[in-house]
C-alpha cells in the first residue's frame, strides 16, 4: 500500500503532523533515489494541491515525471481539468507525464492527451487487445497518437499483462512492440514492471521478459536506443 511522506520526514514528525503532502511516493522509494544520487530516477503521483516546494523536493530526489492512471478498475475517472491543472507546474521542471489507460478508452481521452505540454509516456503500449491484428483499427488509433504528436512516447512493456498466449514467449505481444520500436525508434522505452502489482494470471520470470527485448528490437541499434539513448534523453536531460 502506498502512503504519502515528505521527502525528508521522519516517522515521529510525520505522525504528529496533520498535513499530508499532495504527492504519493513511498518513503523507501525516496530514500533509494537519494542514496542512488544521479544514477536513478523516479515517477510520482501528485494531486492538484501540490506546491512548487514539494515538487522541487521531489526533483532534488530524482523524480522526473508524474503518472495519471485512467484504468477504470484501478482509479476513479476525473475530468480533464483535474489533470490539466497539474501540467504547467510539471512543465516548468522539464518533467514528463506517464499515462496509463486501456485501448478502448483512448478515443475518450484523446483531446486531453494531445493537449499535454510535456513529453507524454504511455504505459504498456496503450494496453492493446493482442487478439486483434496489429494492423487493426484499435492499434491504428494508438499509432496515430504517436504519429501526430511528436511528444508522445510508448513503453514497450507489460507483455505479461497483455498476452493471451502466455509465458515464456509472449508471442502474441511481440508484433505490437516490434511495430512501435521500428516505427518510433527514438520514442520507446522498456521496463520490467517489477514487482508486477495486481497480476492474477501468473508471476512472470523477469529473465523471460528480458528475452522478449531482441524479438521486439531486432538490431543492436534499436536495442541501444530502447535501453540506453532514449531513457538517458528522457530521464537525465530534464
Task: For the regions a language model picked out, list residue spans one by one.
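Alpha-helical packing segments of well-folded alpha/beta enzyme cores
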Residues: 1, 8, 29, 54, ...
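Mid-to-C-terminal alpha-helical segments outside catalytic/metal-binding sites
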Residues: 1-11, 179, 185-189, 201-238
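Structural recognition of the beta-strand scaffold that forms the well-ordered cores
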Residues: 13-14, 67, 121, 155
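Active-site gating/metal-coordination segments in enzymes
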Residues: 19-104, 110-111, 155-167
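Short, electropositive alpha-helical surface patch
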Residues: 23-43, 173-181, 205-215
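Conserved, mostly hydrophobic/aromatic
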Residues: 29, 58, 66, 90, ...
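Catalytic pocket-lining loop regions of alpha/beta-barrel enzymes
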Residues: 79-190
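An amphipathic alpha-helical core segment
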Residues: 197-199
Amino acid at each position: 500500500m502506498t502512503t504519502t511522506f515528505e521527502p525528508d520526514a521522519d516517522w515521529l514528525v510525520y505522525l504528529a503532523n496533520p498535513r499530508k503532502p499532495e504527492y504519493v511516493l513511498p518513503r523507501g522509494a525516496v530514500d533509494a533515489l537519494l542514496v542512488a544520487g544521479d544514477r536513478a530516477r523516479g515517477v510520482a503521483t501528485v494531486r492538484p494541491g501540490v506546491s512548487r516546494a514539494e515538487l522541487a523536493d521531489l526533483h532534488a530526489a530524482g523524480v522526473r515525471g508524474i503518472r495519471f492512471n485512467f484504468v477504470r478498475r484501478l482509479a476513479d475517472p476525473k475530468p480533464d481539468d483535474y489533470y490539466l491543472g497539474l501540467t504547467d507546474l510539471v512543465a516548468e521542471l522539464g518533467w514528463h507525464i506517464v499515462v496509463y489507460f486501456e485501448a478502448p478508452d483512448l478515443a475518450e481521452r484523446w483531446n486531453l492527451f494531445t493537449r499535454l505540454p510535456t513529453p507524454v509516456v504511455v504505459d504498456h503500449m496503450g494496453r492493446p487487445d493482442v487478439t486483434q491484428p496489429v494492423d487493426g483499427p484499435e492499434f491504428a488509433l494508438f499509432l496515430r497518437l504517436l504519429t501526430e504528436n511528436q511528444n508522445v512516447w510508448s513503453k514497450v512493456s507489460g507483455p505479461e499483462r497483455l498476452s493471451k498466449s502466455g509465458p515464456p514467449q509472449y508471442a502474441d505481444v511481440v508484433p505490437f512492440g516490434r511495430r512501435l520500436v521500428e516505427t518510433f525508434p527514438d520514442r520507446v522505452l522498456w521496463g520490467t514492471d517489477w514487482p508486477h502489482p495486481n497480476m492474477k494470471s501468473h508471476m512472470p520470470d523477469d529473465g523471460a521478459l528480458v528475452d522478449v527485448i531482441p524479438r521486439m528490437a531486432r538490431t543492436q541499434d534499436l536495442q541501444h536506443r530502447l535501453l540506453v539513448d532514449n531513457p538517458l534523453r528522457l530521464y537525465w536531460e530534464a
